[in-house]
């Protein structure tokens, strides 16, 4: 950690790195940032020497699900969170501008209670998140500021009633059950079960990408129009599409949020079904392959065995991408070469068989 770095680097990062004060967090609980997590000790009060940029902080107590947040740390910033033992979650604690200098002076007395950022994992973390910006975090992060693997669910019926109560303060709305309104609106699926959704404010605000069906999972499918609509929704910035792919991957890998995995798959599937875009969006596809290569390279082995390889999703989907690039007259030699190298790496590393015919 910090002690393994040259003293001058440690001194520089202490002066220019960010600080996270995580006050009141229970002892012997899980606390992590990016690629590293620990069991907290009795004196734990947070982290020091955090390199500027986007990081993912997460924690859990006992057998509770992980909760976390993304934050774009600035040089010298002091971010304060306070643990609420009653609600078992963290809350923001604002530091008034006129108290920042005093808070920085207090850090010296807290030094032994602050864990240094795990720099041995920083290169891997940066490689997983290099497209993610402060704008990405602001756009995607849940409004209530917490990412959780077990987000609070609410039925559409309950949500409808709650919204109606807000709009009609006298509570006399059509979903009230009384003599005048003996029946209320029901929201059920085809099996008669309540339709559930994540409560407003808790959802990760991913871009809407229609999933492809099994019948659409074949070479020759062309969905460049969907890709262009998605890019327009992102202000024409293809880097933000890759940023969303990266943030979705981290949400699943470190946040243990299954919807992150689903969004990651949807992006890969879409990118594999756009042969007409290979020439005009070559830079996007070149970077896409690099991002996916690094994600698969850094992924724990059990992640693949338990999740990615379960339904052969990647072999089936990437077979379409490899065939589209191979057969394209517009992809260009550099994209074809990079794709062929990626395919060979996957074949050698994971023994995957790509049927591109």
From Swiss-Prot:
Gene3D superfamilies: 2.60.34.20, Aar2, C-terminal domain-like. GO terms for biological process: spliceosomal tri-snRNP complex assembly. Belongs to the AAR2 family. This is Protein AAR2 homolog.
